[in-house]
Amino acid sequence: MLAAKLSGKVIQNINSTFVGGGVAEILSRMIPLVGQLGVDVRWNVIKGSNEFFQVTKKFHNALHARQERITSEDFARFQETTQKNIDELELYGDILFIHDPQPIGLIARKKDMGKKWIWRCHIDISHPNQTVWDFLLPFVAQYDAAVFSAPAFSTELPIRQFLISPSIDPLSDKNKELSPRTIDSVLVKYGIPRDKPIITQISRFDYLKDPVGVISAFELVKKNVDCRLVFAGSTASDDPESNEVLAQVRERAGNNPDIHILLSPPGNDIEINALQRASTIIVQKSLSEGFGLTVSEALWKEKPVVASAVGGIPLQIINKFTGLLSHGIPGTAYAIKQLLANPEYAKWLGKNGREHVKHNFLITRHLKDYLLLYIFLDHQADIINL
């Protein structure tokens, strides 16, 4: 019914990479599903040098309020690469869905193309570095609408804003049910015994995910409870910093036989699924966060989760009901120890978490929200403001 209202329209998604990171993962699941409803949805990526993506990584960190040294040369490189993509990238959608800051400057084409333009911001810009935000705001102001993942992420804008939380696909390789044999085979592959509780964090190798802090929290837990840590992550083609973070994490872990640092290539979803299902507790100790869908992935598997109270995580973790929210290294360690000491409580949290995800963070709800957004932009004359 909703999809029929978009008959004949082309929706063009543009971001900075086909693989690695939450945006690419969401698009890879969402676009085929929308297509099955008869809506013409396509996906393109911008091109950029390693130097360009170093600049956009600085922007990303600065928008998350991390201190970064950003120079006039950085802004000039961003403008130069943006102009090159404006000149070379074919833009043809009736609705152009631009994801995050990297391709934001493509809005310059609106003057000659017209059409409807949406800026989909997947990150928290509520307390941005003001210099970077002052640079990006003139681009944002030209869009027809902006979409944020959580109410706390947004800021005052001269355009319409919409709230659409991201989602997981329960039938994807990362979330579907797995046989015990499959789970065991992954543990054997990576040399992870099941002789003690397994504490796991799944995330990109990114300073904002605080992998070194995860190791520190684990060491505090291990003083009281014998357990092992698995940190499985990937790198992304638009994140040049990730290899540097990986090296630091490996150095911090040293030769501790109870710490397993795994580099999992993008698309290795069944193994990630298996690692989550084999875990006793899932951790997401982010310093800053977009939405943090690894939390919903874990909750869907009925796993007890300890996660930082940042970004979109508090929308997924209702403290002491669907998981435990934590603050800092000691707080994370305390929450993990609490769950290890109370397995029935941990199990109860996991069951509540699955129900919460079922009703709020599955792809079917996400799909409906996007269709309603597209229809709104395409039929604005029918909207009545009360």
Each model region followed by its residue ranges:
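Short hydrophobic beta-strand element within catalytic cores of glycosyltransferases
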Residues: 304-307, 317
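A short, well-ordered alpha-helix in the C-terminal region of glycosyltransferases
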Residues: 338, 345-360, 366, 372-376
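Conserved acidic donor-binding segment of nucleotide-sugar-dependent glycosyltransferases
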Residues: 319-330, 338-343
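A short alpha->beta transition loop at the rim of the catalytic pocket in nucleotide-sugar-dependent
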Residues: 280, 302, 309
